[in-house]
């Protein structure tokens, strides 16, 4: 009996020591779990595009990381515009400062002039890490200016959306941005110019209810969450269980709201192809006049 007790204590002691030593040696983030299929992989398996090797889900990206994936030639617009906390909402200023520090952005969207395959485009990229990419006053102002500049200089617009909706800390000022940006989109369309939107995970709330669904060509990333209200809110309202693919990019494509679903690793080439087609059509239209 004494021998068994000694062995048990000895084993337990050594196991604790070994585990503690190994745990301190393993860097954080070495294993990652996909939020869609819940598969776990060594972080390098996700590759340069941060895509799950099992189901193809694209992990959420900061605006600057996505910009680096798209192009090396870009000039930022309106980097000096900063929200001033119009309602003096408790804790909002501190939240803004944290978001600015994490994302290196002044607001939840990056806008600027970019070159894709030597073609100039007005580019907008929303950042889900900046207060969930929420639509605030300055976000709306930057997006409106993006479309206005594109209209003035006859440029196509490519917009990557990622948002939790309107920013509650700005109240009605936030909601007004939906119509403001949509009006700028309509003026851009009336000028006969191309607008491509890429819906990424997540695109919800006031953004999907306005300018995100106004594009000439609507692309989505695989497995992206796209919808207005949350699943639980809808289920509680309609008293029904929603299907598993509800508010997914695949379901929206099936029902005609999305033109195509493009894996992230092929997205840049697809955008270049669409810009080439648009350029050819524009040349043909001018040539036929």
From Swiss-Prot:
Cofactor(s) for this protein? Zn(2+)
Renumbered zinc finger spans (C4-type) = 34-55
Looking at its record, which EC class is this enzyme?
transferase
Q: Which UniProt keywords apply?
A: ATP-binding, Cytoplasm, Fatty acid biosynthesis, Fatty acid metabolism, Lipid biosynthesis, Lipid metabolism, Metal-binding, Nucleotide-binding, Transferase, Zinc, Zinc-finger
Q: What is its main location?
A: cytoplasm
A Pfam family that the UniProt record links to this protein: Carboxyl_trans
- What is its pathway? Lipid metabolism; malonyl-CoA biosynthesis; malonyl-CoA from acetyl-CoA: step 1/1
Indicate where this protein resides in the cell: Cytoplasm
**Enzyme Commission number, as recorded:** 2.1.3.15
Lineage top rank: taxon: Bacteria
Q: Which cysteines are joined by disulfide bonds?
A: none
Biological process per Gene Ontology, one example term: fatty acid biosynthetic process
GO MF term list: acetyl-CoA carboxylase activity; ATP binding; carboxyl- or carbamoyltransferase activity; zinc ion binding
**Domain CoA carboxyltransferase N-terminal, first and last residues per copy:** 30-289
Task: List the signal peptide residues.
Answer: none
Q: Which PROSITE patterns match?
A: COA_CT_NTER
Would I find Nuclease among this entry's keywords? no
| Catalytic reaction annotation | N(6)-carboxybiotinyl-L-lysyl-[protein] + acetyl-CoA = N(6)-biotinyl-L-lysyl-[protein] + malonyl-CoA
Q: Which residues bind Zn(2+)?
A: 34, 37, 52, 55
The annotation note on the cofactor reads: Binds 1 zinc ion per subunit.
Q: State a GO cellular component annotated for this protein.
A: acetyl-CoA carboxylase complex
Family recorded in the similarity comment: Belongs to the AccD/PCCB family.
Subunit notes for this chain?
A: Acetyl-CoA carboxylase is a heterohexamer composed of biotin carboxyl carrier protein (AccB), biotin carboxylase (AccC) and two subunits each of ACCase subunit alpha (AccA) and ACCase subunit beta (AccD).
Q: Could you tell me which HAMAP family the record lists for this protein?
A: AcetylCoA_CT_beta (MF_01395)
Q: What does this protein do?
A: Component of the acetyl coenzyme A carboxylase (ACC) complex. Biotin carboxylase (BC) catalyzes the carboxylation of biotin on its carrier protein (BCCP) and then the CO(2) group is transferred by the transcarboxylase to acetyl-CoA to form malonyl-CoA.
The name under which this protein is listed is Acetyl-coenzyme A carboxylase carboxyl transferase subunit beta
């Amino acid at each position: 009996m004494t021998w068994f007790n000694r062995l048990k204590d000895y084993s337990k002691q050594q196991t604790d020591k070994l585990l503690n030593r190994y745990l301190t040696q393993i860097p954080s983030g070495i294993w990652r779990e996909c939020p869609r299929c819940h598969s776990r992989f060594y972080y390098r398996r996700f590759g340069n595009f941060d895509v799950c090797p099992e189901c193809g889900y694209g992990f959420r990206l900061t605006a600057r990381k996505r910009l680096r994936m798209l192009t090396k030639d870009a000039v930022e617009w309106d980097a000096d515009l900063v929200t001033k906390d119009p309602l003096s909402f408790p804790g909002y200023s501190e939240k803004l400062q944290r978001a600015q520090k994490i994302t290196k952005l002044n607001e939840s969207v990056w806008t600027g002039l970019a070159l894709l395959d030597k073609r100039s485009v007005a580019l907008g990229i929303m950042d889900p890490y900046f207060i969930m990419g929420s639509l605030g006053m300055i976000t709306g102002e930057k997006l409106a200016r993006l479309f206005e500049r594109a209209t003035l200089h006859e440029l196509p617009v490519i917009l990557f959306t990622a948002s939790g909706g309107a920013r509650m800390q700005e109240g009605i000022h936030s909601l007004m941005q939906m119509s403001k940006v949509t009006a700028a989109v309509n003026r851009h369309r009336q000028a006969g110019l191309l607008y491509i939107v890429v819906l990424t995970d997540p695109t919800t709330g006031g953004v999907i209810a306005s300018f995100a669904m106004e594009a000439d060509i609507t692309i989505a990333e695989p497995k992206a969450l796209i919808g207005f209200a949350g699943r639980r809110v809808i289920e509680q309202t309609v008293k029904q269980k929603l299907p598993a693919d509800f508010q997914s990019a695949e379901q929206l494509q099936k029902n005609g709201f999305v033109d195509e679903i493009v894996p992230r690793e092929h997205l840049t080439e697809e955008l270049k192809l669409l810009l080439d087609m648009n350029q050819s059509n524009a040349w043909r239209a001018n040539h036929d006049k």
